Amino acid sequence: VVEILSALSIRMVHLSRLAEELILWSSQEFGFATLSDAVTTGSSIMPQKRNPDGAELVRGKAGRVFGRLTGLLSTLKALPLAYNKDLQEDKEALFDTVETVLLSQKVLTANILGAEFHSRRMREAIEARQGYANATELADDLAARRGMPFREAHAAVKALVELARSQGRKLEDLRLEEFQEVAPAADHGVYEALRTDAALARRSAVMGTAPSRVREALEDARARWQPRKT
């Protein structure tokens, strides 16, 4: 039983993290997703507010499942290696955990199926470059393509970010001459390295962010969950 609770606790870690992503993505600050009316509620004070109740409840249920596992482990730690009546405590923990996990999966499924994802807003958030998220791509490009030691490439890109930030510019808005003042090995290829689509495509390792790898992961997930013919 304790092994089942352990496995289900790990599953709830993943479900809770997914729920947290949905909560963040549906917030006004992110604006990456809109959850359906079926899994949200309004506010008694603020008429415009949509509370992601379903996802929040799943996140909370994770703590409940972890508590069941911790409780049973605490019971087991003091038992001799034989059957004891204390072990009756595992039934309530097991049944409650299984029911909680199954319900959490249904709720998250409803959240995802009913959600509207705003890809344009996601791209806008990336391309705003407020955090210079493409700086690492530039460092990797200087090291891999132009042969700079990564330590030097890292320092050069840090200086370029400071330059761009001080002027309220994006890295890709810098002139080639400005790149070369800090990193003489830089050429016009740095602009390709800084493009969002190019950066995603380069991450082509298994489970990477390249579109081809994302499609593979989706196809694999669908295949795993297809009803098995007997």
Regions found by a protein language model. Give the residues of each.
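Internal glycine-rich alpha/beta core junctions
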Residues: 1-75
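Glycine-rich cofactor/substrate-binding loops
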Residues: 48-230
